[in-house]
Regions:
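N-terminally biased helix-coil "hinge/interface" segments that flank
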Residues: 1-417
Length: 417
């Protein structure tokens, strides 16, 4: 009888389950906190909870994750350069560097104008060490992808970093939606690479050299190599797995399923034993894409969502934070700090117009990992990172320790790195 290992790496916890493939009977299960600084720690903790004996008979792994979804919802990911060929991008997904060059094709696939490879080369050389991936999108590239393929090859040769073309992700018309999808995919490539590398490394520690199948956002499976190239297809992977799991556990072929995790709350529908798909492309964070996935409504509200008091208003922010109960068990002095704030803090009388500027006295900062652009930090932010690595601190505490104004610490910018 085949034995399978199911792994789910979420924004808060990593879950592992051993089951008989033919019967669906669960043989063992375990949970461990997801460790974003080093994913392998959380994965290892979950597998240790399963035990070596139970793992020894596993013949395949199914991996689902909300890391891609959470990265998109929270606006995180790697630094991306965008090359637009023949038309500028009019969407709202942010990029770190962008260029628009001559080239592109018409709706019949005929070349509209020659590709300006000289401008492409100048741009690519100007972003060396400034970006981690390149997104390439040409006008009507779904009819003729030659220009996109040329730029992708140049990016890999000059920069030596991952590059992805819009036509590789979507065959649908709609330039801006295709570019948005491509940018998201580029941002997620290092995220997916880290996840697969972490899973593969921990499996080898347990003597397992077996296939890993990654759950797509539509509930089907994809290979490791495909997941590395098209990580955006794993957006809503975790919620899709939840839909299928709920159907299997309840025996219901028609259901509405609500899955609240640490970072997001997801609601999906099962009809006739299958997840209802968003064939026209799903919307993530208010942005239209060409990603075909389960039709799931995702909101940045979860068990770890940041709660802000903005004047008279209570605001749920999509960013994920460490719950105070967890922080208190991990670091000393948290409770005493909260009691001090409760006895002395004065609430804001007027709400701030820019919610990103609101940082409360009860919010302490600790590093999850080093920023991707560590070499570009100014002296104040670099010192701030050193201080909070020693113990969690508020912005005010860190500012006093450094002898600077609190406003000089770029906390919001650092959180996005």
């Amino acid at each position: 009888m085949s034995i399978g290992l199911g792994l789910d790496t979420g924004g808060t916890n990593t879950d592992a389950v051993i089951l008989e493939m033919e019967t669906g009977r669960v043989l063992a299960k375990a949970k461990s906190p997801t460790t974003h600084g080093d994913l392998s720690i959380g994965i290892r903790g979950a597998l240790q909870g399963i035990g070596r004996e139970a793992l020894s008979e596993v013949s395949l792994v199914s991996l689902s994750s909300t890391l891609a979804t959470n990265s998109v919802v929270e606006g995180r990911g790697c630094r991306v350069a965008l090359v637009c060929i023949g038309k500028d991008y009019g969407g709202t997904v942010p990029v770190d560097r962008k260029v628009v060059v001559d080239g592109g094709h018409n709706g019949h696939g005929a070349e509209e104008s020659s590709l300006d490879t000289d401008s492409v080369e100048v741009f690519l050389r100007s972003v060396v060490d400034e970006v981690d991936a390149v997104a390439v999108n040409g006008l009507f590239a779904i009819r003729n992808p030659d220009h996109e393929r040329t730029v992708k090859a140049m990016a890999r040769e000059i920069l030596g970093i991952p590059a992805v073309c819009g036509h590789e992700l979507s065959a649908s018309l709609g330039f801006n939606e295709r570019v948005s999808t491509c940018i998201m995919n580029a941002r997620l490539m290092p995220v997916m690479e880290e996840l697969i590398r972490s899973v593969r490394g921990v499996l080898s520690e347990f003597g397992l050299d077996i296939p890993i199948h990654i759950v797509r956002g539509n509930g089907s499976l994809m290979s490791e190599d495909m997941a590395r190239e098209k990580p955006v297809e794993t957006v809503l992977s975790g919620p899709s797995a939840s839909l299928i799991g709920a159907m299997t556990m309840t025996g219901r072929r028609d259901a509405v399923v609500l899955d609240m995790g640490g970072t997001t709350t997801d609601i999906g529908v099962i009809r006739d034993g299958r997840p209802r798909l968003s064939s026209e492309g799903m919307t993530i964070g208010g942005r239209r894409t060409h990603i075909v996935a389960a039709r799931i409504s995702t909101s940045g509200i979860g068990g770890d969502s940041r709660i802000l008091v903005n004047g008279p208003d209570i605001v749920l922010d999509p960013s994920r934070v460490v719950p105070m109960c967890v922080a208190s068990s991990r670091w000393s002095g948290i409770r005493e700090h909260l009691e001090s704030v409760a006895s002395t803090a004065t609430p804001l009388r007027r709400p701030s117009r820019d919610i990103s500027c609101v940082i409360l006295d009860n919010e302490l900062f600790t590093p999850v990992r080093a920023p991707m652009e560590r070499d570009k930090l100014n002296q104040t932010d670099s010192r701030f990172m050193e201080l909070i690595a020693e113990r969690p601190m508020t912005i005010t505490q860190a500012a006093v320790a450094m002898g600077v104004y609190p406003s000089s610490i770029s906390a919001t910018w650092l959180e996005g790195r």
